[in-house]
Amino acid sequence: VGLAAPAIMWLAFVPMLLVATSYYYLNRVDPDCGTTFSWATKAFGPWVGWIGGWAIIVADIIVMANLADIAGRYTFLLFGLDEQADNKYWVMLIGVLWIAVMTYICYVGIEASARSQWFLLGAELVTLLIFAVVAPYKVYSGNAPETSVKPSLEWLNPFSIDSTSSLTAGILVAIFIYWGWDSLVSVNEETEDKERTPGVAAIASTIILVFIYVIVSIAAQAYAGPDFLVDNADDV
């Protein structure tokens, strides 16, 4: 999609906001930690509920394996161990260890999980916000790479994308990166004011995500340029 990546980010936000809003109202009526499984079963019958529940489980397994691979690889890269980062067995081992750590935190209890999430998410958001400020500053001050380009409002225009297939593919990928806000509703039975708080948190999360994704995508392609990002797609 070229320079229209920020447009893809806000377009993908629209269906996510609608789904989050539906979760809000469903949770108000029936705050059940089974979420999709429970609600679909009550509305459409056990078959639809079963399919919905298993679809989430299968997706979780695929995503967990993918994220474990990323965590394993970048753990080595963080310490400059490039050789180990290119070894799938070492990466798999560290990825499994990360899964074990997360499983233990979940076993300890929801409060430990919440505290760890506050720390990790806070560090992530602060880092991304700093990048979103520093990168454009370097572009306008002339200290960015030669491939850099100055931001433009046209980047937010989805109609600048000539190919319908590229637009569709971009939205599908962008929807995937919004993954995770629904976990807020899955802990509704362990939340104060369970009829309201999880749903509000879900909607707020999608709004925060679209803000972060749009400004970071603008900053990244402004600093490095779209061609550089395409050539190094595995790293971004």
Segments and roles (model prediction):
Residues 1-91, 205-211, 215:
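Extracellular loop-to-transmembrane helix junctions
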Residues 2, 34-35, 45, 49, ...:
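Glycine-centered flexibility sites
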Residues 5-9, 80-90, 119-236:
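Helix-loop-helix junctions that connect adjacent transmembrane segments
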Residues 12-24, 98-107, 181-182:
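Central hydrophobic cores of alpha-helical transmembrane segments in multi-pass inner-membrane proteins
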Residues 22, 75, 106-109, 132-136, ...:
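Hydrophobic membrane-targeting signal helices
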Residues 25-28, 51, 97-123, 187-190:
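Membrane-water interface regions at transmembrane-helix termini and the short interhelical loops
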Residues 31-40, 104-111, 185-188, 192-199:
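Cytoplasmic juxtamembrane interface segments
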Residues 45-58, 94-97, 160-174:
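Select transmembrane alpha-helical segments in multipass membrane proteins
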